[in-house]
Amino acid sequence: MEITHRAAVLGSPIAHSLSPVLHGAGYEAAGLEGWEYTRILCQAEELSRVVRESGETYRGFSVTMPCKFAALDFADEVTERAQQIGSANTLTRVDGHWRADNTDCEGALVALRELLGHTLPKRAVLVGAGGTARAVMWALRELGCEQVTVVNRSDRAAEYVELAQGMDVSFCTYDADLESVALQADVVASTVPADVLKQHADQLGHAPVFDVIYNPWPTPLAIRAASNGYPVVGGLSMLAGQSYAQFEQFTGVEAPREAMREALSR
């Protein structure tokens, strides 16, 4: 079969990426013939060259670390949410130019809705303040969250002014009374490595938990929250969720969500 449309994931390391699994399953389920999705090893400083030298058959690129900031700088057009979050995980060819977007925030929205159902969180705890945390903050805002306590080693409130519009955002360190903070929350969302939170899991596991980690799973935080009777959702839900929007931007076809999500369980 002739390959007429291509997409790929860019980053380093890249061998572990599940994006080909997700998009490949989407192509098959949607009946898209002539589509191919691959991995391309790419450092941040190489992104501009790799994308510019890609052939006309390339419709888009999924972008992972360390290339997310370079993708934002490279693009001819940047979506408002990517600008607010400060990084891009999606580059789509549109009428001969490249548009940067961040669909991680949609992935976080999918995961939070899976976790909470129809319940809208009013108060949240967000662990970490990096790029993934900013995507989760966007999702919390979309859900109408009113108050977010960010647990982080440093106070980065100044960086969140635009993103936090309409929300009361405060910062605290890991030395705070995290159990009290968690007990008052409708959801705890963690964006930091599992080992970072291991010693704080007992304190934070007192609310429904969304942990962006999917390997290893379950994390100590998820285990503690589940043992306390709370629902938990891991990073595979976010990974699948962000891929739906990418798939639709690249192909112009509605994502076959169920088939793509099920592909991660094979």
What is the role of each PLM region?
Residues 133-134, 218:
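N-terminal Rossmann-fold NAD(P) dinucleotide-binding loop
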Residues 165-234:
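Rossmann-like adenosine-cofactor binding region
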